[in-house]
Amino acid sequence: MRRRDVMKLGALLLLDACTQRPADPPSGQVAVAPGLTLVMPSPASLNRRIEVSQLVVARYRTQTIAFEARISAAQDHFDLLCIDTLGREAMGIHWTSNGILAKKAPWVPENLRPENMLADIVMLYWPEAVVAGALAPSGGTLVAEPGIRSIRLRDKEVIHAEFQPPPGADPWNGKVRYRNLPLDYALDIQSRVLAP
């Protein structure tokens, strides 16, 4: 092979390596921050039946969007329906022990992944022991204090959540401010339980 051909081949291999995105985590896991995955628990591990309405304001860098979410959860399923401010169905998610089924409107950005929406909900509202166990395989830890959840990787906070219901109150009733520091997004969520 001539030197010129070797250089072309090397350049093509380098270009290919630079344009490939990181591998997706193994099945059943969701990347929630660089180097941190959440092993998705079962919907049953929420350990309650609940119907919730939420108003969500999401901020990503300079963009802000608002939407309404309706949640229905029981031992055998977790359903999430997202509706935009014009009343259009943006996304529907049905999660069971068999997996996640999602339907997105064509205008919803491709990088808005149902698995990540569910992972955010799990990290906010699932029992502390379940969240801690789901983060542990990738080295993540949960530090929980009254009104605060902090998720850390190698002693550095990567996710921070502040709950505004009174300490001891149901976190599904009230406000929460959630920040994913390395991915540079924040969620302000106002929740109201419709049926326990």
Residue ranges and their predicted role:
Residues 3-7:
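N-terminal export leaders
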Residues 18-32:
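Bacterial Sec signal peptide processing site at the extreme N-terminus
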Residues 43-60:
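A short, Trp-centered hydrophobic/proline-enriched beta-strand micro-motif
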Residues 55-86, 95:
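N-terminal beta-strand/beta-hairpin edge segment
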Residues 82-86, 95-99, 104-107, 191-193:
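A mature extracytoplasmic/lumenal domain signature
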Residues 101-130:
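Acidic/charged, solvent-exposed loop-and-adjacent secondary-structure segments enriched in E/D, K/R, S/T
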Residues 139-196:
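Gly/Pro-enriched, hydrophobic low-complexity segments
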